[in-house]
Amino acid sequence: MTGVQTCALPISIGFVPSYSMHPLIGKVANVEWVNGFRRDDFSLDVTAAVKQIADLKPALTFITTPNNPTGSAISINDIKELAIATAAVNGLLIVDEAYAEFSNEKSAITLIAKYPNVLVSRTMSKAFAFAGVRLGYLAANKIVVDALQLVRLPYHLSAITQAAAEVALEFQDELLAEVSKLASDRDLVAAALTEMG
């Protein structure tokens, strides 16, 4: 045998428009990015998404709920369908819940026990107004967390960030109270825009 053999990179998929960092995460993980499709109104067509997952067999499937930038949320039943579809192709479903506190939908964290291929990422940047601290967290099956521990950067979280997060959690009731006001104002603006056409 002569020459160099190459093999195709694994695939990751996300349904655009969505959070712009997901393709970069795929690139860092050495997987090819594929733009999945949404409807013309930017809502996620779960039936079409399940078909795309079955056809492409992605190693990583990204969804964001509520979606950034559209604000639309995905129901827990739709996420469950995506979890089943990704499990069928031995893939992981990464559910970005950065804006979860602004949604009335049930969290995908409730699916992890039954669907170990579901990973849920969250951040303190949004609801806790903690963007400058750059602190996020992941909820996943223990096996997934153990695997991630093997590749995480050492000293990835400073003592100052940890201390600031502890203080924020002590005041979470006050900080999260602002979320309801923001959500209420958002709904008023959305209703006014809808009325204007």
Which residues are covered by each model-predicted region?
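Substrate-binding/gating loop at the entrance of the active-site cleft, primarily
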Residues: 13-31, 154-155
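Active-site pre-lysine segment of PLP-dependent enzymes
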Residues: 44-56, 69-127
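Short, small-residue-biased leader/transition segments that mark boundaries at the very start
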Residues: 2-9
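Structural scaffold positions in well-ordered secondary structure
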Residues: 7, 61, 96-98, 121, ...
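Short beta->alpha connector loops at strand-helix junctions that form conserved
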Residues: 16, 35-40, 97, 122
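PLP-dependent aminotransferase class I/II
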Residues: 117-194
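Short beta-strands and strand-loop turn motifs
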Residues: 33-37, 60-67, 93-97
